Regions:
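Short, conserved micro-motifs composed of acidic
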Residues: 98-377
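Trp- and acidic/polar-enriched beta-sheet ligand-binding modules for extracellular glycan
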Residues: 1-98
């Protein structure tokens, strides 16, 4: 690696270089190599990322000599010195002698959060947890050998969840089946096959009538476009606001959070990006909008955090739905070195449910967070 500076003469002067050391690796491991996971939206499961022989870290370089009136900086890498995958996330330049330290914008009450508990679901590969608005049902999806299926647990008088029961009528799609909202008025189900250019979005609205699920038709969005086969969604309790985590031509990075408002004809208007404060240059998704229509919890790998994907909270600042507060990390008691995502907050019981991956295995976890802490109003 070599750094050179041009002072306006058109010639670059070397101001820092490293000679190859064939015995000592340039970077040292900062965490176990098998802790890297990503959330594969197309397969709706957590996959182990390709192994990286030498994990990335942060390197601080202080120039050995000053160059006055520098107008250009050239950084040369010799990637042939190290085998395996290579990736440079960012390069920062500062005139300070103090190194720039990455910091995590952590929620103020993170130290008060209780210990996280595992919801026992032996033999299942849980994802997309949802609590019904009456607090009596835990709904989640689990991936079998053939497809994703929907299961429901009933809450007993002791507050414990019953053994899961498969909901056949909610598991009819050929591969993807998941619930994003389960209310007394309507249910939002994802994973529906759809044709692009038809305004269909892969979601449908259901109603539970006499213990039977009745489809109210496909959820349609004006000019809907999504690079992936599926998306993650959340919807306001009255159905007027829809928020999606998708990737389009207008995303700031990978997938972004978008909102859409319901029209008089029952369809939804054009998706609008929720802004640069909440959407990073990486991926945002897995959102849940709480009942105040101001608080949103979601998962992202685009902000300083503890692992691959962390869970954050943000607050809507005005009526445009495009201005949000800086996302706050829910802290290391919730977020691990691995994948933490698909959050769902049960306001009635004041518990956050989420999926955590440990050594490639997904667990459904729960933790108590007071409503007065998580929701500002």
């Amino acid at each position: 690696m070599k750094i050179s500076v041009d002072n306006g003469s058109g010639k670059y002067e070397t101001v820092w270089s490293r000679k190859p050391n064939w015995q000592t690796p340039v970077y040292k491991r900062t965490f176990a190599a098998d802790r890297s996971y990503y959330f594969g939206r197309k397969r709706r499961k957590i996959e182990k990322a390709p192994e990286v022989n030498l994990n990335p870290g942060i390197e601080y370089i202080f120039l050995e000599k000053d160059v006055a009136n520098g107008i250009a900086l050239k950084i040369e890498f010799n990637f042939a010195l190290l085998h395996g995958q290579k990736q440079i996330d960012a390069i920062g330049i500062s005139n300070s002698a103090l190194p720039i330290q990455p910091t995590i914008n952590e929620i103020s009450f993170s130290d008060k959060i209780q210990e996280v508990e595992v919801v026992p679901l032996k033999g299942f590969y849980p994802s997309s947890p949802v609590i019904s608005t009456d607090g009596k049902k835990l709904i989640f999806s689990s991936l079998s050998d053939e497809k994703e299926e929907v299961f429901i647990c009933q809450k007993g008088s002791n507050g414990k969840w019953s053994n899961p029961t498969k909901e056949e009528t909610l598991s009819q799609n050929s591969y993807y089946n998941y619930i994003e909202h389960y209310g007394s008025d309507f249910i939002l189900k994802g994973g529906i096959g759809y044709d692009k250019g038809t305004q269909e979005s892969g979601y449908e609205i259901l109603k539970l009538q006499s213990e039977h699920y009745q489809s109210q038709g496909a959820l349609k969005i004006a000019a809907y476009n999504n690079y992936d086969e599926t998306s993650e969604a959340t919807i306001s309790s009255d159905g007027t606001i829809l928020i999606l985590g998708i990737e389009t031509d207008f995303t700031h990075g990978g997938s972004d959070l978008y909102f859409s408002k319901k029209k008089e004809d029952g369809t939804y208007g054009f998706l609008q990006n929720m802004g640069k404060m909440i959407n990073s240059a990486a991926d945002e998704g897995m959102p849940q909008l709480l009942s105040d229509n101001k608080t949103i919890v979601f998962s992202t790998n685009g902000f300083s955090g503890y692992g691959e994907y962390d869970i954050y909270v943000s607050y809507r600042l005005d009526e445009t739905w495009k201005n949000w507060s800086e996302p706050q990390n829910l802290g290391k008691k919730i977020n691990s070195n691995d994948f933490d995502g698909l959050p769902f907050y049960d306001e009635r019981d004041e518990k956050l449910y989420f999926i955590q991956a440990i050594d490639g295995i997904q667990y459904l976890k729960q933790v108590t967070i007071p409503k007065s802490d998580l929701m500002k109003n």
